A protein has these predicted regions:
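A sequence-level detector of short, solvent-exposed, charge-rich linear segments
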Residues: 15, 19-23, 27, 61, ...
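Alpha-helical scaffold segments that mediate packing/assembly in large oligomeric complexes
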Residues: 1-47
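Sequence/fold signature of self-assembling virion shell proteins
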Residues: 71-201
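Intrinsic-disorder/low-complexity coil detector
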Residues: 23-24, 51, 65, 112, ...
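Long, positively charged binding patches that form subdomain-scale interaction surfaces
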Residues: 27-106
Length: 201
């Protein structure tokens, strides 16, 4: 049943993406790159309902750093050097959503790195609802070549109900970058930092 956990994780990520339009316009921001003032505004909105926490992927978190170098303390420099990101953003805790891959080739990610969610703790209810229905059905089949095949079926549903206490930040420069190493699925090559197709995977 390990695959069930991965499936639910994938369904939760898809449900969060598709439900972003439930949020009021003031609660969502789309920008190319990280806009410090916009994130501060979202944190202010979410903090009206509780202590805000930022949920994002590692790729998003490494961009959430102050732009002015004079704001870096020695502790921040050490944390950036050791972890590649800050554990808190202006006092707001940053939780990293674990990134997974769709299969054993490690080329396509499960979670879109372009999204960050600001969710207040202590708010009423949880934004994601997961429901299981019925028992687990296990069927075993004997194939013509005498091999056995086992199929497992479990009915599950995932829905997001976002209220006005939740905020979303969309980094359009990361949005949709689901392939690792900027892998080009058509040519089978890797896109380099300057846009060239180079090498094979």
């Amino acid at each position: 049943m390990d695959g069930m956990d991965e499936l639910i994780y994938k369904e939760v990520a898809a449900a969060l993406r598709s439900s972003i339009n439930q949020l009021p316009p003031a609660n969502r921001v789309a920008a190319a790159g990280f806009d410090e003032a916009a994130m501060d505004r979202l944190i202010t909105i979410a903090s009206a309902y509780g202590t805000p926490t930022i949920y994002c992927t590692y790729e998003f978190a490494v961009k959430m750093i102050p732009h002015e170098a004079w704001r870096y303390t020695e502790a921040m420099k050490n944390e950036l050097w050791n972890n590649g990101r800050l554990a808190t953003y202006k006092g707001t805790k940053v939780i990293i959503l674990e990134q997974g891959f769709e299969d054993e080739t490690n080329t396509r990610k499960v979670i879109d790195p372009g999204y960050a969610w600001v969710i207040p703790t202590g708010a009423d209810g949880k934004p994601v609802k997961i429901a299981f229905e019925g028992g687990t059905i296990v069927d075993e089949f004997n194939n013509y070549d005498r091999s056995r095949e086992i199929q497992v079926y479990k009915k599950v549903g995932v829905v997001c109900m976002l209220a006005n206490n939740i905020c979303a930040y969309v980094d359009t420069s990361l949005l949709g970058q689901m392939y690792t190493w900027n892998y080009d699925g058509v040519t089978g090559k890797v896109i380099t930092y300057d846009g060239r197709l180079d090498g094979t995977v």
